[in-house]
């Protein structure tokens, strides 16, 4: 029922005993629960490739439900066989030289007597340059230059938008749409009302019958801008509908080219599921083929070479991190947990697609570990464990003492220890980054998370179908967004003092909305499979219960409308120009939401690693780009 957040739930003792019970008391209780004869070490079994539910009788005679998920697709031998030469110093040295040359391009644009620009193109050149380095995944090297360029553009921004240059007589759609999008993404206060200026006398966005390449590119940037909508911005919704239709029609008319591929990519992934490293990989292909780029007075060949080098240099780091992650997975005893899914490589891929700065290794590995543990817990609480066992496990985890594991069924001991060890380990990493101990904070998040799972396990066991409100509030917790995000972001070189942390973690609106979208989107992709496994409660079924006569289609329409509203709310929480919290402090929580959203874009990409999931792993982690 859950995938991989958490808001406080009412405190309750699942054992109807004080959580301060001694280890002796817990051992007395646990004697009534037999073990399964499973150990933490040994060779992994290979589950079926299907997603059906099976039942199995353990050696203690307990009949258990078990999801028949496929096994880990990326075995140790395969990971160890990966090779790369891009970790050699010569590649880093070449990249550093190119970084210096690109900085000179930025600086030349800022010079009064610069050769690259004129008063007739100085605005679009700056915006295009910023947009290009961001889409190519190399913006981290040019933060000061980007700010300087956008400050300049914003100084000429007006309620009528901008033209190509500061001396342009009228604003044009391409410059205004791309400028609006880029400025908004960087926290500048720009109103969507500026787009109304590009409507005709009938209130419709105007276009020509011929659909020239220049116009198509302008509408493409209008579409990209429309996806960064805030709540209540009707013109952005209108722009999205118009531009999506226009671009789909244009694909039927233009020849196969870099432009057509760029349109397909943007229509396919939008913004909320277009993960930065995936976009960089795709844009490298498009950027290298785009003949329009060669007309620019900016040296695009150097931009492209730098993007390729940076992609491959990070690829060499990914190989080392993957090798470490696979060793951790094996040493933790995870392969012996045959009742659950093993998607640690896929989770690492998502992390490396949203945080590919070399120094954020702790974030990538911490996220992959947390999500792996969450998936184990999901399968244990939803299918494999009995209610009595799960109550015992929940109470034992709240004691946060390794001796509490002694009273657990054998298969639960491994789960307890991997959670206990990993949370403690990540807390030590977070303490180095934040300068304070955050373990108690993390423990409370995990306690609330397990309480939400326990609630769902009882619903399954009793066949209770909650109201939508009951389900939704608990489901935002059990979605796992908070527990997957909290500790990993604390390992980063971004300060999270308490007053900032409360604005990105619980009880912030950002955390609530990010958790909501994971719960709602997950339900739209999983509810049928969950129902087949005996997990009736979902936002779809609960909505239908609350609204007698409503069909599944009605429920899905309602949930999808909620998702659209949540997305706009998330945009606002991230980009609100009046917020006291820097975008950099919120961005990774927001991007984790995007990563999970991508996993559910087509179907449940976590239970079954579909073609799109495997392609993402290969294109962003396994295969380098050709220089």
Curated annotation (Swiss-Prot):
UniProt-annotated binding residues for Mg(2+) 2: 378, 382
Name of the protein: (-)-alpha-pinene synthase 2, chloroplastic
Catalytic activity entry: (2E)-geranyl diphosphate = (1S,5S)-alpha-pinene + diphosphate; (2E)-geranyl diphosphate = (1S,5S)-beta-pinene + diphosphate
Main location: plastid
Expression induction or repression: By wounding and insect attack.
Binding annotation for Mg(2+) 3: 530
CC per GO annotation: chloroplast
Species, as recorded: Picea sitchensis (Sitka spruce)
Keyword Ribosomal protein: no
Record-linked InterPro entries: Isoprenoid_synthase_dom_sf, Terpene_cyclase-like_1_C, Terpene_cyclase_plant_C1, Terpene_synth_N, Terpene_synth_N_sf, Terpene_synthase-like, Terpene_synthase_metal-bd, Terpenoid_cyclase/PrenylTrfase
Gene Ontology biological-process annotations: alpha-pinene biosynthetic process; diterpenoid biosynthetic process; green leaf volatile biosynthetic process; monoterpenoid biosynthetic process
Family the UniProt entry places it in: Belongs to the terpene synthase family. Tpsd subfamily.
Residues binding Mg(2+) 1, per UniProt: 378, 382
Reported cofactor(s): Mg(2+); Mn(2+)
Domain comment (free text): The Asp-Asp-Xaa-Xaa-Asp/Glu (DDXXD/E) motif is important for the catalytic activity, presumably through binding to Mg(2+).
Listed Pfam families: Terpene_synth (PF01397), Terpene_synth_C (PF03936)
GO MF annotation terms: lyase activity; magnesium ion binding; pinene synthase activity
The UniProt record lists the keyword rRNA processing: no
Location of the protein in the cell: Plastid, Chloroplast
Lineage: superkingdom: Eukaryota
């Amino acid at each position: 029922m859950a995938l991989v957040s958490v808001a406080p739930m009412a405190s309750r003792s699942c054992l109807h005993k004080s959580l301060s019970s001694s280890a002796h008391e817990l051992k007395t209780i646990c004697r009534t629960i037999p073990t399964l004869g499973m150990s933490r070490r040994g060779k992994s079994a290979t589950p079926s490739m299907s997603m059906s539910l099976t039942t199995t009788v353990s050696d203690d005679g307990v009949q258990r439900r078990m999801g028949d998920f496929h096994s880990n697709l990326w075995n140790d031998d395969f990971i160890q066989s990966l090779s790369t030469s891009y970790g050699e110093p010569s590649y880093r040295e070449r990249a550093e030289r190119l970084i210096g040359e690109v900085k000179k391009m930025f600086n030349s644009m800022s010079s009064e007597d610069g050769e690259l620009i004129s008063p007739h193109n100085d605005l679009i050149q700056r915006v295009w340059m910023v947009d290009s380095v961001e889409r190519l995944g190399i913006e981290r090297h040019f933060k000061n230059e980007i700010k300087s360029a956008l400050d300049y553009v914003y100084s000429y921004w007006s309620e009528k938008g901008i033209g190509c240059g500061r001396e342009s007589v009228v604003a044009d759609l391409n410059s205004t749409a791309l400028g609006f999008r880029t400025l908004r993404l960087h926290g500048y206060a720009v109103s969507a009302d500026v787009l109304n200026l590009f409507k005709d006398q009938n209130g419709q966005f105007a276009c020509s019958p011929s659909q020239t390449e220049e116009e198509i590119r302008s509408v493409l940037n209008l579409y990209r801008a429309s996806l960064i909508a805030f709540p209540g911005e009707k013109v952005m919704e209108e722009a999205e509908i118009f531009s999506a239709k226009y671009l789909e029609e244009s694909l039927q008319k233009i020849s196969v080219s870099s432009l057509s591929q760029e349109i397909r990519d943007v229509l396919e992934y939008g913004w909320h599921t277009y993960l930065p490293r995936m976009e960089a990989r795709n844009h490298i292909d498009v950027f290298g083929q785009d003949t329009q780029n060669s007309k620019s007075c900016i040296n695009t060949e150097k931009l492209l070479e730098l993007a390729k080098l940076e992609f491959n240099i990070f690829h060499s780091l990914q190989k080392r991190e993957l090798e470490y992650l696979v060793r951790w997975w094996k040493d933790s005893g995870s392969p012996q947990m045959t009742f659950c899914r093993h998607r640690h490589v896929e989770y690492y891929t998502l992390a490396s697609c949203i945080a590919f700065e070399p120094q954020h290794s702790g974030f990538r590995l911490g996220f992959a570990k947390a999500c792996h543990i969450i998936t184990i817990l999901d399968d244990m609480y939803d299918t494999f464990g009995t209610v009595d066992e799960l109550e015992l496990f929940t109470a034992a985890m709240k004691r946060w003492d390794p001796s509490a594991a002694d009273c657990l069924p054998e298969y639960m001991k491994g789960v307890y220890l991997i959670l206990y060890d990993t949370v403690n380990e990540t807390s030590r990493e977070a303490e180095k980054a934040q300068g304070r101990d955050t373990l108690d904070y993390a423990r409370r998040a995990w306690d609330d998370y397990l309480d939400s799972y326990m609630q769902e396990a009882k619903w399954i066991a009793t066949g209770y179908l909650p109201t939508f409100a009951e389900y939704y509030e608990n489901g935002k917790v059990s979605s796992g967004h908070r527990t997957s995000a909290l500790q990993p972001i604390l390992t980063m070189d971004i300060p999270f003092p308490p007053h900032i942390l409360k604005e990105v973690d619980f009880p912030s609106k950002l955390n609530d909305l990010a958790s909501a979208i994971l719960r709602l989107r997950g339900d739209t992709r999983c509810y049928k499979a969950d129902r087949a496994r005996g997990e009736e409660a979902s936002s779809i079924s609960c909505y239908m219960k609350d609204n007698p006569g409503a069909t599944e289609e009605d429920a899905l329409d309602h949930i999808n409308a909620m998702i659209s509203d949540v997305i706009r709310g998330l945009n606002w929480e991230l980009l609100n120009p009046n917020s006291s919290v820097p975008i950099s402090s919120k961005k990774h929580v927001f991007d984790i939401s995007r990563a999970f959203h991508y996993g559910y874009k087509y179907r449940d990409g976590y239970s079954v690693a579909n073609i799109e999931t495997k392609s993402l792993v290969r294109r962003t982690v396994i295969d380098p780009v050709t220089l």
